[in-house]
Each structure stands twice: as C-alpha cells, then as structure tokens.
Regions:
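Substrate-binding clefts and catalytic carboxylate motifs of secreted carbohydrate-active enzymes
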Residues: 1-114
Length: 114
C-alpha cells in the first residue's frame, strides 16, 4: 500500500466504492492468505486499502462493499459461503466482523479531522 502512486482525475473529487474482501464470521487464519476466507484476511485487506487511500489527495469519500453478508444463489461457492456473498462487514446474523471495527475507527478518525 505504501508504494501505490495515485494520479486519478487531479483537481476533481474522487469517491471510492466497492472495496473489501470476503470473510466467514468467526473464522480466523493467516491474514495474508486470500483463500482462507478469514476475518483476519478481511481486516488486513481493509487496513491495506485505507493505507493506500491516504496517498490519494483528492479522495473525498469511501463506501465499502458491502455492509451485510447476503444470500446470492447465483454465486455458489462450494467450499466457502455456499449461496452467500460473505464480503460484508457484518454477518447475515448481525455479528460484526473484525473489519467492521477497522471501518468504524476509520470513520471516527475522519470525523475528528474535520
């Protein structure tokens, strides 16, 4: 993330949406292994994204993909998630994943910077 160079529409406001990754609530594992579907991986991915965003001078907002895990029968994954899209910050049962707290802290920090 520290080495990313951003030169996107200089002088114009930029909003980034649909960033993030998948995680099964309660699953823990190697934060560097995407296929682990762990909360640790998802949390690290959000941390990396937010670190990159610091280097975008014209960034004006973000919107992670997605808030809640949701049923998606056309997106069947036989090993992880089944008929569910598990990229939410909150599980389909309302449990907050580790990445939810990363984003909460990020937005709280942004509020104090204003």
């Amino acid at each position: 993330p520290d080495q990313a160079v951003w030169n996107v529409a200089p002088g114009k406001p930029l909003f980034i949406s649909e960033f993030g990754g998948e995680a099964l609530y309660g699953k823990h594992g190697d934060a560097e292994v995407k296929s682990s579907w762990s909360e640790d991986y998802q949390a690290q991915l959000y941390k990396d994204n937010l670190e990159m965003f610091k280097h975008i001078p014209n960034l004006r907002g973000t919107s992670p993909w997605i808030l809640f895990d949701f049923r998606s029968p056309f997106r069947f994954h036989p090993h992880q998630g089944g008929e569910w899209n598990r990229k939410g910050l909150v599980s389909d049962q309302g449990q907050r994943k580790k990445a939810w707290y990363i984003m909460r802290d990020y937005y709280n920090q942004k509020k104090t910077e204003q």
